[in-house]
A protein has these predicted regions:
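Glycoside hydrolase catalytic-domain context in secreted enzymes
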Residues: 1-157
């Protein structure tokens, strides 16, 4: 378990005892991304921000966004090690509490209801393609400055 936890950056380690194969995961509410290695993603799109999706008030658009990300997860690593991306570190569901929020582009709206509805549709779309999601940043992620000094924000969200 220590190995699974300590070495699980952007993937889930294989656990032979229970028959779990290694699973590739990636970040990016606006598409597949990895700030640690910018060359990991081939032929995948950068999408619009979550805020723009929410301004449409259109659940179908959010669902299609999720489906497209799911499709890209399956084929997006074909020029890399040929392993699909099965887990997506998104969507971000915090709300816009301040215009100075460092990650507002990752969140849908200041309206919690709208944010939840749009996130649910995006998740349904992505899951329908066999890619699971890690809903992130429920709260306590209002700034980027000094965010990692204590590390609490990352674990709480």
């Amino acid at each position: 378990m220590i190995r699974v936890y300590n070495y699980a950056s952007y993937h889930i380690e294989a656990i032979e005892k229970i028959g779990l194969a290694r699973i590739n995961c990636a970040d990016g509410p606006v598409g597949w991304a990895c700030f640690m290695d910018k060359t990991r993603f081939y032929d995948t799109c950068s999408f619009c921000s979550q805020t723009l999706v929410a301004t449409s008030w259109n659940k179908d658009i959010a669902n299609r966004f999720g489906k497209t990300v799911g499709d890209e997860g399956i084929i997006g690593n074909e020029k890399g090690d040929k392993s699909p991306y099965s887990g997506w570190y998104a969507p971000g569901v915090n709300i816009h509490r301040s215009p100075f929020g460092g990650r507002n582009f990752e969140y849908y709206s200041e309206d919690g209801m709208l944010s939840g509805i749009m996130a649910a549709e995006q998740i349904k779309g992505c899951n329908s393609k066999g890619v699971f999601t890690f809903v992130k940043h429920f709260a306590v992620n209002e700034q980027e400055t000094h965010r990692s000094i204590s590390g609490d924000s990352s674990y709480l969200t």
